[in-house]
């Protein structure tokens, strides 16, 4: 800058001197001769000679300093070989010029003769070197022009590199802004906090006038202004001018709304757009809008969240009105990336909200289950207490009876028929106690194993016949019994289960509406149960009993009613009666438990005519050898049916 000013000042001074001389000549009318001899003049002869001498010495000093600078420059830089001769010629030319001016400074006064000779020689050398230098410039100028072109290309490349560096720096700055915005957005897990943080940070980064989020309503008919950077001020003038923005809504069929939702890119909004005018509160600056996917409902079937319906919100950004610049590419990229990050953050927040909601529901269900469990536990405790009370209430009188029965049999003076009745009462009471105990065990979740022991089969048959006679007479049935004396007395088994099964079989027949005569029969099972052939197979049965350790005995009841019609039984009524008869079901369970067989025969009316079961007992030969009273005859007793019914 200083060098330029100095050159301009020297040029101005040169033209000023020329102008002064021309003006003086015009004033005199003719060119006057130099008055160098005038001693009073400023430019006297002495002064001019001294000035020229000083000028020559200064020029010589300057010329001698320039080669020194050139030599220093050449030594500090790598000058290509084609330019070395040119530099040397310039150095020689400048040195000769300096010597010429230096020697010329000694010629303005008295001097030696060799000074003029030296001046002449150096002037000749200077002329020759200057001519050679001029010839060298003819070949040097194209190289200089080529270097200039190369310099221009390098400067152009430099400008392009500067522009690319600027773009890279802008991209880096954009990525930093996006990373900062993403960090701010991801700091919260609440949807409303995420949206509000997005508006605040985006406005700070881009210098926005306003920023708002429009979300569709539940029925997808309108877009509601739900989140805004600057809250509305409800003053009368603003409400009158803009119609009041509190709870503002626009139809979802608006052209800008449809255009933004159909595109994934950032869309520019015109100044007359409803979205732009409402978001900017009147006159809008450069405005853009972009859709933001929002996940509302999740389905967690199979552990994978599935979007039921995609919902799009709209993010609207407005620049200040007086800002001369419009939206840049980097700013649009920031808005697009931020919208994507907001969509991801909102989807994560929705999934967490759904998980929290499911957790709360599960906790509520768990509390309800705990309450139901406590209620069920209290109900079970109450039920167990009630059953225990009922069991105790049933056991007490039965145990009293069991305690009195031995006192009755203590004297041994009772007739045989009364003794049988007392034994039947004892066995019935024991069976009742066992049933009560079994009911308590089932309620407690425990099952007792089968109690197998030696017992008297004859006693069980007699007591069963006694109880059956009493029940039949009480219900208006006649009773008769057919028991084969060929049965062994002592066998191994569960006498209580046998007695219980016999009573259940009798209970099946007691449900008949048509009365009649009930026949109770007991005989060994040998593969043929026809009554007419029973006597013929007694000897074979005895051989079968003594040849094996086990014996099968059939117990059965049969009803004979007067006026019985013969017709084919219906299988459907049979099944229905079996399902409705609890005694038959209980009997079947006992038979299944003891691994026996049951047989039910129906008459023409679909009523049960006979029921029989087959049980397998283990024989005791020592006991059988003492039962020598077996003659193979049939013991029969009968009681006619009651006519009062």
From Swiss-Prot:
Tissues expressing the protein: Expressed in etiolated seedlings, leaves, roots and stems. Highly expressed in flowers, stamens, pollen cells, tapetum cells, carpels and ovules.
Molecular-function GO term, any one: ATP binding
UniProt xrefs under Pfam families: ETR1_N, GAF, HisKA
Domain GAF: residue ranges: 190-346
EC number: 2.7.11.-
Membership in a protein family: Belongs to the ethylene receptor family.
Subunit-structure text: Heteromer with ETR1.
UniProt name for this protein: Ethylene response sensor 2
Gene: ERS2
